[in-house]
Each structure stands twice: as C-alpha cells, then as structure tokens.
Amino acid sequence: MKLTEEQVAQYKKDGFLIIRNFNTTEEIDIVRGEMKKLIDELDTPSTISIFTTSEQERKVDDYFLGSGDKIRYFFEKGSIEDGKLIVPKDMAFNKVGHALHDLNPKFEEFSYSQKIHDLIYSLGIYNKALSGIMYIFKNQKIGGEVDIHQDSTFLHTTPLTTHAIWFAFEDSTIENGCLRGLPGSHTEGITRRFITDPNSESGCSFIKLAEDKQYNKSDFVALECKKGDIILLDGSVVHYSEPNTSPNSRHAYTLHFIEGDNGVIYENDNWLQSAKPFRVL
C-alpha cells in the first residue's frame, strides 16, 4: 500500500499519519492468536523484568539489554507483588520484544509483508532495516503510562532516519490510552539520547543534546484508531500515552525501521543491539 503525495506531505508536516484499514481483521487475529499461544505456553520466568518508562523507576537489567535479537517478556508494574503474579498471566505483561519479526514465523510473515515494504518505499526509504519490534499489551486497569518521548532518543542513527509503524490490534481510544502526538514537533530535532554506559549503575544513561523542552499536554492530538488502522510516526515526533484504567485492553504492535544504507550509522552505544546486522525489508 503506497502513500499518496497528499499523505506524504501531511506526514512530513505533522510527524505522524493515521492510515485507516491497513490490516484486515484476519491478518491481525493470526498474530494475536500467536501471541496468546506464546503466553499460554510460557512458564513464569525466573527472571522478572518489569518495564516502565518512568525515569524515577526505570531499571535496566541484562535481560532487557540482551533482548535485541531475542523474544523476551516484560511484566507490567501492577502485575507483580513480592515476586509473584497478582493478575492472570495473560494480563500480566507490558510488552514482548524485540525480535519477534525474525524469530517467530507468524510475526515474520506479518512484519515483512509487501504492503509494509510499499508503504515505507513510498516515503523514499529504499533500503530499510527493521529494529526494535514490540508487541504492546496496554492491558485493562493496569496498562502503564508511556511518558512523553521521541523514539530516536532510544534508536538513534546519524543522520536521523528512524520511523515507526504502530499497528492497532484493538480499538485505541482516549479511554484506554491511545497515542497522543504533538504536531510538527519532529522538526525541532531530539534533545537527548539513551545510551549504554558502563559507568552507570543501571548500565545505561541519558546524554543531553539540547535543552529539554516543557510540553503542555493540551497541545497534543489524540490519535484514536480502530482495529486494523496504523499510525506512521517520525522518530523525532514527541508523543506519549496515558495509563489504561478502562475495562478494555489496547493491544498494539510497533515496528521501527531505519535507513539501512547511504552512509547512515546505527550508533553502537544504542541500548538495542543485535549479534547480527538488522535484516533489510
């Protein structure tokens, strides 16, 4: 599915673009069913890694840092108490990452589809490499807030070439914590990077590139989606999501891609690394 000239212009203006009915219900149900199977078959791991974007609570462990070329499971903060699950297992996870697209055949077929190739190609990115793939649960009642951020802070290239496709696997509404984006914010660059840091107790740290900006949440646009819609996101666009306190989950899938050629450098101090080069779509 190729973007029209009008869609490309809108994306370049806002830094995000909603595309309706990109995936069929059947396509989504296949990979959602596969994720259910993976969760059902998973023994509760001895390593419990809780994922949060709160800088006050962010903890980076070896399990997380080693997930770039593996399938690993990260728990929601509100699902664990004294090292034990306090919610049903299928509601306990924040996300699964970061190599589903390469290690699971169902997700591989979904992620490397021709229509995704055509979509990215129409942006003028011809040699695209996939990285940082996540299945996001945002489960009912306990789905955590995702703080205001820019994806290129975490997946940095020189020059900046990171983009993301956010797939709505369920309806995404204001009530269950839809994405919210700040139009035009991608034109101002990024203010910091998240890097591996052997001198940091956690193994990672932020480095400042420019003065942090103060944002008013009322300036952000709610990017509500129906199941099957996608959101295209520039890696520099500022976005976030509220916690999900509703009775409805908000499953989604995020696929990041970068320019894989033309002298573009994927920084070797990015937190997400793979033993093999990122596979080109």
Curated annotation (Swiss-Prot):
It is an enzyme of class 1 (oxidoreductase). Its EC number is 1.-.-.-. It comes from Dictyostelium discoideum. Keywords: Dioxygenase, Iron, Metal-binding, Oxidoreductase. Fe cation binds at residues 149, 151, 239. GO terms for molecular function: dioxygenase activity; metal ion binding. This is Phytanoyl-CoA dioxygenase domain-containing protein 1 homolog. Has alpha-ketoglutarate-dependent dioxygenase activity. Does not show detectable activity towards fatty acid CoA thioesters. Is not expected to be active with phytanoyl CoA. Its cofactor is Fe cation. Gene3D superfamilies: q2cbj1_9rhob like domain (2.60.120.620). Belongs to the PhyH family. PHYHD1 subfamily. It holds the Pfam family PhyH. 2-oxoglutarate binds at residues 95, 134, 149-151, 166, 241, 250.
